[in-house]
Curated annotation (Swiss-Prot):
Keywords of the record: Neurogenesis, Synapse, Ubl conjugation pathway
Pfam families registered for this protein in UniProt: F-box-like (PF12937), SPRY (PF00622)
Residue ranges constituting the F-box domain according to the UniProt record: 6-54
GO biological process, one term: proteasome-mediated ubiquitin-dependent protein catabolic process
Domain B30.2/SPRY, residue spans: 64-256
Family classification: Belongs to the FBXO45/Fsn family.
Pathway: Protein modification; protein ubiquitination
Quaternary structure and interacting proteins, as annotated: Component of an E3 ubiquitin ligase complex composed of hiw and Fsn.
UniProt function note: Required in the presynaptic motoneuron to down-regulate the levels of wnd and restrain synaptic terminal growth at the neuromuscular junction (NMJ).
Subcellular location: Synapse
Identification of the protein by name: F-box/SPRY domain-containing protein 1
Length: 258
């Protein structure tokens, strides 16, 4: 950066920064946040006009018509969630992503199990996202993680997520943990653990530092589901069989402890 600009950069008023930054792309905004403390402070306000404008440009108006994004209260958090949402190019051919960008719809195709992965995978750090099932579960409704090598569609009604060594899942229908084609016990470890009810919020917690996968239901931590995960890139993934069922996923960022 020019020496003169470096000298005066911290003194640029917020209203001028807002005007300048409103013309920039996201990558440019990230670079600007590294220029000086003043610019970093301004961009750390996740609800300012710059992030609101970016959010309005990228997200469909449909995304704001429900309470789906209420779990990510700031504009920047909503924008981040959008970039982590379901990937329309990495899902079963029987699935489409609705205009809101966060909800998948499974078409009523007989004898098929269909899934979808998120746009961004994780190999480092701690990550949490919320999944909400709308509509009947059918015989298979699995939520979890998968690598890019895991199948995303198969013939028949089958617990596809957890069917091989590239995916790990929790079947909400029978509370079984699934991996490598095997059931790994009932989850959570409770006597007569309650079954999932449509509309309940499932929070998936992937800890790439401790190599574990855990779940919460309605903000109650259910315990660690899987340990000793391999050092691979994992994507938020679901698998469903019921026609016209809809599944929403909202990325939350690092989980809050406690």
């Amino acid at each position: 950066m020019d020496d003169d600009l470096t000298e005066y950069a911290p003194d640029i008023p917020d209203n001028v920064l807002e005007l300048i930054f409103s013309y920039l792309k996201l990558q440019d905004l990230r670079n600007c946040s590294l220029v000086c403390k003043s610019w970093n402070r301004f961009l750390n306000d996740e609800n300012n006009e710059v992030w609101r404008a970016q959010c309005m440009q990228k997200l469909s108006p449909d995304a704001f018509k429900t309470d789906l994004l209420s779990v990510v209260p700031t504009y920047k958090a909503k924008l981040r969630a959008f970039f982590h949402a379901w990937n329309p190019y990495d899902c079963s051919r029987h699935v489409y992503i609705k205009p809101n960008g966060f909800t998948l719809h499974r078409n009523p195709v007989a004898q098929s199990t269909d899934g979808s992965r998120g746009k961004i995978g994780f190999q480092h750090g701690r990550h949490a996202w919320e999944v909400r099932w709308e509509g009947p579960l059918g015989t298979v409704a699995v939520v979890g993680i998968a690598t890019k090598d895991a199948a995303i569609q198969c013939h028949g009604y089958y617990a596809l997520l957890g069917a091989d060594d590239q995916s790990w899942g929790w079947n909400l229908v029978d509370n079984l943990l699934l991996h490598n084609g095997d059931a790994h016990g009932i989850y959570p470890l409770l006597n007569n653990a309650p079954k999932y009810k449509v509309g309940e919020r499932i929070r998936v917690i992937l800890d790439c530092d401790d190599n574990t996968l855990s779940f919460e239901k309605n903000y109650e931590f259910l315990g660690v589901a899987f340990t000793d995960l391999p050092d691979k890139v994992f994507y938020p993934t679901v698998a469903a069989v019921y026609g016209n069922t809809e599944i929403s996923m909202v990325y939350l960022g690092p989980p809050l402890d406690g």
